[in-house]
């Protein structure tokens, strides 16, 4: 106790000294649809990860960057941990696991109620060996039962691996700001890795592709969206205007799916393209001419060559 008091006195006496720059790398892991991307977007203050109600929306590791004074927080939003059903799923699961090796601390998100999945329990065991971790119980806005929330906190505490347990709502922001002082404790001194005004390291083309895929996920029937991949084939800024011409390929697994994506009279494809174009214009700060094309690549989720070509690199 005396030592803690002495440390506090020293800190107080030197409070006017400027803090040195530091950075902390943070992985966000958890089951599909637990709110990792929503939390990333809320903390960053920008849309860097697409969000839908469908599980497994995030496929690649997404980087969000926040700089608060001398501290830069680098968030790695990972695919949801689940039992793989194809080679794409396997790569997604490997990406989530590999992220634990690249960070200073891990945020593991949990639902406020319900049983823990086998994949969640496996991730908890992986965290025992990986390093510091903080538990984040999300979606508390959906829970009015204080006793149930306390019971959930106790369940998570019993894992015995988390330095802290935080309750948040990524939807309305409740408790989210409390994460920054906790994460700051794991920061390492040194120059920032990214510009202080950066919010992601994702290329513009990749962001555009994700926005198109988000609209397909939102508008398409359940059986189709997870068989879709999106790539930007061309991205050209016109030198004489503020217009950007973008050509996008939407890849699907079945000819029947191609017809559904295009829709009667092309209406579904127009709906997807129109909604994506508006988001692209907001992202790029310019007018966008977005052309979307649909191509069939049968069983691409189980084809390593196609996965490589579509940008799903092995971690």
In which residue ranges do the predicted regions lie?
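Canonical P-loop GTPase G-domain recognition
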Residues: 132, 141-200
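Walker A/P-loop
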Residues: 37-38
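Conserved C-terminal guanine-recognition region of P-loop GTPase G domains, centered on the G4
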Residues: 94-165, 236-240
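Switch I (effector-binding) loop of TRAFAC-class P-loop GTPase G-domains
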Residues: 24, 45-71, 117
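Single conserved hydrophobic/aromatic residue that forms the stacking wall/gate
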Residues: 1-12, 62
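P-loop NTP-binding site
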Residues: 204-315
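The conserved Walker
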Residues: 32, 55, 172
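Switch II (G3) loop of P-loop NTPases
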Residues: 46-50, 72-88, 112
């Amino acid at each position: 106790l005396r030592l803690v008091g002495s440390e506090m006195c020293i800190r107080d006496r030197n409070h006017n000294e400027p803090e040195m720059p530091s950075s902390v790398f943070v992985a966000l892991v958890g089951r599909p649809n637990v709110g990792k991307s929503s939390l990333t977007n809320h903390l960053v203050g920008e849309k860097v990860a697409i969000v839908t109600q469908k599980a497994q929306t995030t496929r690649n590791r997404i980087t969000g960057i926040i700089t608060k004074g001398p501290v830069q927080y680098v968030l790695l939003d990972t695919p949801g941990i689940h039992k793989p059903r194809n080679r794409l799923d396997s790569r997604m699961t490997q990406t989530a696991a590999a992220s634990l090796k690249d960070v200073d601390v891990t945020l593991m998100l949990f639902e406020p109620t319900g049983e823990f999945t086998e994949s969640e329990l496996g991730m908890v065991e992986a965290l025992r060996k990986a390093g510091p971790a903080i538990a984040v119980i999300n979606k508390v806005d959906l829970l009015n039962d204080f006793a149930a929330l306390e019971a959930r906190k106790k369940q998570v505490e019993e894992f015995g691996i988390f330095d802290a347990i935080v309750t948040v709502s990524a939807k309305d922001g409740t408790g989210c700001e409390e994460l920054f002082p906790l994460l700051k404790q794991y920061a390492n001194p040194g120059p920032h890795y990214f510009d202080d005004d950066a919010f992601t390291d994702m290329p513009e083309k990749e962001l555009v592709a994700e926005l198109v895929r988000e609209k397909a996920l939102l508008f398409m029937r359940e059986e189709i969206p997870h068989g879709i991949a999106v790539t930007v084939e061309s991205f050209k800024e016109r030198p004489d205007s503020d217009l950007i011409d973008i050509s996008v390929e939407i890849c699907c697994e079945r000819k029947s799916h191609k017809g559904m994506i295009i829709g009667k009279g092309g209406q579904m494809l127009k709906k997807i393209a129109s909604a994506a174009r508006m988001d692209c214009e907001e992202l790029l700060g310019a007018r966008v001419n977005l052309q979307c094309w649909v191509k069939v690549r049968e069983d691409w989720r189980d084809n390593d060559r196609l996965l490589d070509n579509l940008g799903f690199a092995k971690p």
